[in-house]
Amino acid sequence: MKKLIFLFLITLSCSTSNNKNEGHANHAISDKNQNSLSPHTVAMAMVGGAHIHIDYSSPSVRNRIIFGGLLAYDEIWQSGAHNATWIETDYDLLVNGNKLKKGRYGFFTIPSRGDWTVIFNKNWEQHGKDEYDQKDDVLRFKVKPIILNDIVESLKYDIDEIDENNGLISLSWEKSKITIPFEIKR
């Protein structure tokens, strides 16, 4: 009888451990129940054991010109609506050849006709870009946007695992997409 109970407990333990990362697969959570034109949304994924979390509000195109229209070129944008978008990691990352220490950061961009500027800022808890200060930038670099054939109606972030040490963060909206490769630093 003891052996039977022991085998049952081992089987239960194994099935539970297989599901432990199930909730951390690349996914987005959106609060569609709220009455907002820009619902609060979250993108999360596990990449090589690191938990990457992006918190943002997701505005929609709604038949507007976004980049170079609603959002002027060459001006700071909180990369979402309402509060500044923030990104959190529980491991140090290597982003664009620079170390980004584990923690939570405000995420901003400067859209442009050419390369966009990507910014990780230590002030993550702010409304929009009102309190943005360049002196609080932890990391700033340029990326080349990808022009999409189809319109992405609602702002969307994705986090993809390339392999156990590398991942990719992407932001897509309207007809533009930027990608930010990163490496997990152990």
Predicted regions and their residues:
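Short glycine-rich, polar/acidic loop-and-turn segments at beta strand-coil junctions
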Residues: I10, S58-S60, Y91-L93
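Primarily secretory-pathway and cell-envelope proteins
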Residues: S15-E75, W124-R186
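Sec-dependent N-terminal signal peptides
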Residues: L4-L12
